[in-house]
Design a protein with these regions (language model features):
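Feature for exported/extracytoplasmic and membrane-associated proteins, marking the mature portion
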Residues: 1-279, 311, 315-376
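Metal-dependent active-site segment of extracytoplasmic phospho-/sulfohydrolases and closely related
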Residues: 269, 275-301, 306
Length: 376
C-alpha cells in the first residue's frame, strides 16, 4: 500500500485488438525469433536492450526510459487457461474474470461496489471513450463515461438561467415516482447519478494547469483527461480508457502500424507520468496497460494473426520495476497450437493490484485466489 494519505487510484489503458507480445518485448537473442518472423521482426541492432536476452521495441523508447528509472513492471506471458482467440470473447474474459462462462459483471464494477457499496460517490469509476467497457459495468454501480472532457457536461453552451431551468425539468423527470417499481427506480437513480457526475466532471479542466504537451491523438488526449480528473481530486478510484478500437489487430502492415501505435501510446504514458509529477499527483496513481491476447508466433508475411500469451505493463512511482515471469518458450513443442503459452494468469495480476494497491480483498472480484506478483 502507498504511504500517502490520499486514496490509491488505478488507471487502466486497454490496448484493443491483441498487441503482439513478440514485437513489443523482443526475445532478440533467441534464434527462433528470427526463424519464426522472417518478415515481421525487429532487428537486434534496433532493440532497446533490457538484458542479454530481451529488449523493448524501439517505439517504446519513452516507456524504456521510465523502466530505467524503476517505474515500470513488465509482466510476461499473461493469459488464462484454454485461451479464446476471438476479440470479443477474450476481452469479455479479461473484463469479467469469467473464462468458463459469459459473465454479466465487470471486475472493476465489482471493485467499485466493494469500495462504495451505497454509491455515495458517482465518480468512483470514470471511463474516457465511447460506450462503457464491460469491466466497469455492474448492476447499481454508477460510472461516468466521457467522450471529451473539455466539452463534457449537461447542456453546455447555454446561459445559466436556461441551464438551471432545464436541469430542474430533468431532475423532476428522473425523480422516482411512487409505485413505479424497481426498474424505474433504478433508471431514475442512474439518471440522477449521470447528471451529478456530468456536472462535477465538467469542472476538471478549470482545476488543471500543466506545462506538459500531450500528443495530438486520442490515446494522448484520453490520458490527459485521466490526469485532469485525478488531479481534480473528485475521489475517483478507477479511471479507464481504450486505444482506438481494435487498432492493435495487426494482420497486415504490422511493421509500420505497430510501431506507430506504440509511438503514440508510449509517449502518452511518459507525458501522463510527467504531468502527474508536475502536479504532485503521482504518488497515489498506478497505471495498468493490457491487451486481450498476443499474436501467433509465426508471421503471415505482412502481419500476425490472433494468438494467446501476451504482455502487460504496470507503471507508477510505487511500482517495483523489473521483469516479472518467464518469457514463454518459442520451441515448437512448447507452443500452444502455434502460440505462446501463458505462465501468468491475468487474475493474479488483477489480484496484485487490488490487494496490494487498492487495498480490497480480490477473491470476490476475480472469482478465486490466484498467485500474486511482487511488483507492488
Amino acid at each position: 500500500m502507498t504511504s500517502t494519505k490520499k486514496d490509491p487510484v488505478l488507471a487502466v489503458l486497454q490496448l484493443s485488438g491483441g498487441n503482439d507480445a513478440l514485437n513489443t518485448i523482443i526475445p532478440y537473442a533467441d534464434p527462433l525469433y528470427a526463424d519464426n518472423r522472417p518478415s515481421v521482426r525487429v532487428s537486434e541492432d534496433q532493440v532497446l536492450k533490457i538484458d542479454d536476452h530481451i529488449g523493448f521495441n524501439p517505439a517504446l523508447g519513452p516507456i524504456k526510459d521510465l523502466f530505467d528509472q524503476g517505474k515500470v513492471a513488465i509482466i510476461l506471458g499473461v493469459g488464462y487457461p484454454n485461451p479464446n482467440r476471438s476479440h470479443f470473447r477474450s476481452m469479455d474474459i479479461w473484463h469479467t474474470c469469467e473464462p468458463e462462462k459469459v459473465g454479466n459483471e465487470g471486475w472493476l464494477g465489482r471493485a467499485i461496489r466493494d469500495l462504495d457499496p451505497r454509491g455515495e460517490n458517482v465518480l468512483t469509476g470514470v471511463n474516457f471513450g465511447r460506450g462503457l467497457p464491460r469491466s466497469l459495468a455492474a448492476p447499481g454501480v454508477p460510472v461516468a463515461s466521457v467522450g471529451n472532457l473539455e466539452t463534457y457536461g449537461v447542456l453546455t453552451g447555454i446561459d445559466d438561467d436556461q441551464r438551471d431551468e432545464a436541469l430542474d425539468i430533468f431532475s423532476r423527470m428522473y425523480s422516482p415516482a411512487i409505485g413505479r417499481g424497481q426498474v424505474m427506480d433504478y433508471l431514475s437513480h442512474t439518471g440522477m447519478d449521470a447528471l451529478k457526475g456530468a456536472d462535477i466532471l465538467s469542472t476538471a479542466p478549470e482545476k488543471y494547469s500543466s506545462t506538459v504537451e500531450y500528443g495530438n491523438n486520442s490515446v494522448a488526449q484520453y490520458m490527459r483527461n485521466i490526469a485532469q480528473t485525478h488531479i481534480a481530486e473528485f475521489g475517483t478510484r478507477f479511471l479507464y480508457t481504450t486505444a482506438p478500437y481494435n487498432s492493435f489487430d495487426t494482420h497486415a502492415g504490422q511493421m509500420v502500424g505497430h510501431s506507430a501505435l506504440w509511438g503514440e501510446v508510449s509517449a502518452a504514458v511518459r507525458d501522463f507520468q510527467a504531468d502527474l509529477i508536475e502536479n504532485n499527483a503521482a504518488d497515489n496513481m498506478t497505471l495498468l496497460v493490457f491487451t486481450e491476447f498476443g499474436r501467433r508466433v509465426h508471421d503471415n508475411g505482412s502481419g500476425t494473426d490472433h494468438g494467446s500469451g501476451g504482455i502487460a505493463f504496470v507503471v507508477g512511482e510505487n511500482v517495483k520495476g523489473g521483469v516479472y515471469g518467464e518469457y514463454p518458450s518459442l520451441e515448437e513443442s512448447k507452443l500452444l497450437e502455434g502460440d505462446l503459452h501463458f505462465n501468468n494468469d491475468f487474475r493474479g495480476l488483477y489480484s496484485t493490484v487490488l490487494e496490494k494497491w487498492i487495498g480490497i480483498d480480490a477473491k470476490s472480484v476475480v472469482g478465486g485466489e490466484f498467485e500474486q506478483m511482487a511488483f507492488l
